[in-house]
Amino acid sequence: MAVQQNKKSPSKRGMHRSHDALTNPPLAIEPTTGETHLRHHISPNGFYRGKKVIKTKNDD
């Protein structure tokens, strides 16, 4: 089992953890419906970049 040779200082510990922070997911607003969705994903209504790409249950 690996054991550290020297104790890591609080500064080095903080530097190691600097990339662990959580970030908000990148959201986009669909121009036709105004709904928010993940970037590069289809909105819940089936729109992508202003065009209808799939049929949903609510469609006639």
Swiss-Prot record:
> Annotated Gene Ontology MF terms?
structural constituent of ribosome
Where does the sequence pass through the membrane?
A: none
Instruction: Say yes or no: keyword Protein transport present.
Output: no
Establish whether keyword Chloroplast is in the entry.
no
Q: How is this protein annotated for GO cellular component?
A: large ribosomal subunit
The biological process GO terms on file are: translation
Which keywords annotate this record? Answer: Ribonucleoprotein, Ribosomal protein
Top-level taxon in the UniProt lineage: Bacteria
Note the InterPro entries from the entry. Answer: Ribosomal_bL32, Ribosomal_bL32_bact, Ribosomal_zn-bd
Where does the record place Basic residues bias?
49-60
Which parts of this chain are annotated as the region Disordered? Answer: 1-60
A Pfam family the protein falls into:
Ribosomal_L32p
Please give the family membership noted in the entry.
Belongs to the bacterial ribosomal protein bL32 family.
What is the protein's given name?
Large ribosomal subunit protein bL32
